[in-house]
Amino acid sequence: MSKKILKDVSRNRKERPWRERKLENLQYAEYLRILNFKKANRVKECGEVLRFVADDEGRLRLYQTWFCKSRLCPLCNWRRSMGQSNQLMQVLDEAHKQRKTGRFLFLTLTAENASGENLKQEVRKMGRAISKLFQYKKPAKNLLGYVRSTEITINKNGTYHQHMHVLLFVKPTYFKDSANYINQAEWSKLWQRAMKLDYQPIVNVEAVRSNKAKGKNSLIASAQETAKYQVKSKDILTNDQERDLQVVEDLEQGLAGSRQISYGGLFKEIRKQLQLEDVDAHLINVDDDKVKIDEVVREVVAKWDYNKQNYFIW
């Protein structure tokens, strides 16, 4: 009797991409092996066996597996992004309950491209600068809370574009007058000062509006942008092995010890109030699928078949 291929479907009937992420994970693990990273075997074993509970309608919920938690692992990053997005939406909902008149802004902060050699230094510099930015008088007087994430994109010439996405929660007085409102040019000058740059950096700021009548509102879109992958898998797995190996080596070293996402002000306080723990500690329970399995009728075990390149039910 042939084994069935795993099919794990979300609440909105979209199949979860276990196979795609595992194939990417194996390619990443192979690059680590070639580069002589000690964690290569550990990464390869990520998510080999998935244990689910199922109800009488066949709905699955992951309850046990082992994730490598490597920063660039496509399988872990997929779970991590879901968990971060889920946590962030909880924080935003609570923030709006506590400060109903608060408004949201989406701020993107950039700097000149970095080489692989100085990427780590530039990422750390941005982390220090953003704390300084929000201590300046004009941003601080209306800022209630924020969440920021660092994203790295890879340029065709082998350099890296490091930038930050910041979701700000501000008092309504931010929009009152020129003494409170900070336009894009001012944000650029403030960021230049915080980063100690000899050029004016490109920044983008826009008000975030919740318009549920038009489907996905801009607050949800901004939250998802903030909580997304630090580095997209397609940027490090291009089938150009020489190029990919250099990128993996640069990013492994450049991102070591850095925080992908962090909270400040009211958002940080709310995370403590909600007792939200580090997402990496809970890559199993990250789903935003609220369908509760009321009656577990069986366990479903799926194992990765290295020959057939897929998960099969055992």
From Swiss-Prot:
Pfam family, one: Rep_1
UniProt keyword annotation of Metal-binding present: no
Keywords: DNA replication, Plasmid
Protein task: Produces a single-strand nick in a specific site of the plasmid, and this nick results in single-strand replication by rolling circle mechanism.
Family statement: Belongs to the Gram-positive plasmids replication protein type 1 family.
One Gene Ontology MF term: DNA binding
Domain of life, source organism: Bacteria
GO terms under biological process: DNA replication
Name assigned to this protein: Protein rep
Annotated residues for binding of DNA: 229
Lineage: Bacteria, Bacillati, Bacillota, Bacilli, Lactobacillales
Acetylation keyword on record: no
Organism: Lentilactobacillus hilgardii (Lactobacillus hilgardii)
InterPro entries recorded: Rep
